[in-house]
Structures are given as structure tokens and as C-alpha cells.
Amino acid sequence: MYAPKGIDESIESFCKKADVFKSFQVKVPEIFFRNDDLCHLIIEDFSDNLYQLNITQENSDIFIKSALDQLIRIQNIDCDTEIFDHFDLEKSIANKDLFIDFFCRGYLNLSDSSIPFDTIDEGYNFILKRFYELPLCISHYDFETRNLIYLDSKETGVLDFQDAMIAPYALDLASIFKDLYMVWDKTQVDDWLDYYKKNTQNEEI
């Protein structure tokens, strides 16, 4: 693993959060070697069984429920503000700006005069109001199929967690249920949500 200096996804953040995750039995890679000067880590190889490339309709129930088991452990981690930042309004607005830049301008090729900024703001503000009313917990922040690996032990390995932060609990659920690469029908999602609710240990949720 290579993490250049000066970016948010730092070696320090990865290692610190890896230790915290492991203490709550989250399946993250072992770190065998660290060199801050070279910006390198040697970490455990979790294999090539990446969710993004291997999940199907046939195995999705096993894969997703295994991922939810790991998510529940992540959400049990203490919200230590010395380690985890808050998913605050500034970050939310930054995500809205990414939507405008990459989707509206980049993908749809819209000019600024054609982008419905007021409608986007109205919809985003409505979502954020509901979003920030939800209970807070530790969020992976990228809990999607490209960052999950199904291990030989029948557990889910978790990668790319250096940006984990304190956020409303639904953030990671939305990431896995509304994945960028897979589309699940409502019946499946409802079943997985029931599984999550039955197994979560967070009484607020």
C-alpha cells in the first residue's frame, strides 16, 4: 500500500483506525511493515475475491449479510473525536459540489445556466435535515462492494477505512444497499434491513 504524504488518506490515519477496528473485531488487514519516510505499508493480502467482481444475485444474501455483520461491529466503536472527525455540514456541502461538478457538468455536460441549482439545494437540504436527525455512530464512509472482500473464513474483509468518521448510522447502509455497481430489488433490501435491525446492538437505532 502506498499513501503519498500530504493527502488526507494518510498512513497515520490508516494505522490508527486499523488498531481501533481490530479491537472491535472488525476484519481489517494486518499491518506487517510501516515506513513513513517512503510512505509505504506492507499489509495482509485478503485475496482477489472482491465483492465488486464476485457478488451475484445467487450469492448476494450470504455476501451482504456477512458485510452487515462487519458494519455492526464498526458501528459499535466508540465515537472518539481524537481519532474520528465528524461528518459535518461542510463535508455534506462538499459532496453536493462533487455531484454538480462530476454528474451535472461532467456526465450530463450541462452548462451552469442549465443546472437547476435551486432545486438541487432544496432537495439536498431536505435530505440533510432528515439525515442529521438520525443517531450517530462510526461510519466507514465508503462501505461499498469495491472495498469489501469475501474471505476463505466466510467473513468479510474491510478495506479503505482510513476516512472513517462519526456520522448518522444510515450513511453506510445506503452505501451497501444502493451500491454504485449493483442494483438490488426492494424485497432483498427489506430483508437485509430486517437482518441488520435484528442484529444491531445499538439501542438508539
Task: Give a label for each model feature.
Residues 74, 125-173, 180-187:
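Active-site acidic catalytic loop and adjacent metal/ATP-binding pocket
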Residues 24, 67, 92, 141, ...:
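Active-site-proximal structural scaffolding
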Residues 11, 61-68, 117, 121, ...:
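Non-membrane alpha-helical structural segments and their capping/turn regions in soluble enzymes
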Residues 97-107, 169-204:
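Active-site activation/catalytic loop segments of kinase-like enzymes and analogous catalytic loops
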Residues 1-89, 93-94, 98, 105-108:
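ATP-binding pocket architecture of kinase catalytic cores
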Residues 79-86, 90-91, 95-138, 200-204:
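An alpha-helical support segment within catalytic cores of ATP-dependent transferases
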Residues 21, 74, 127, 192-196, ...:
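Hydrophobic alpha-helical packing residues
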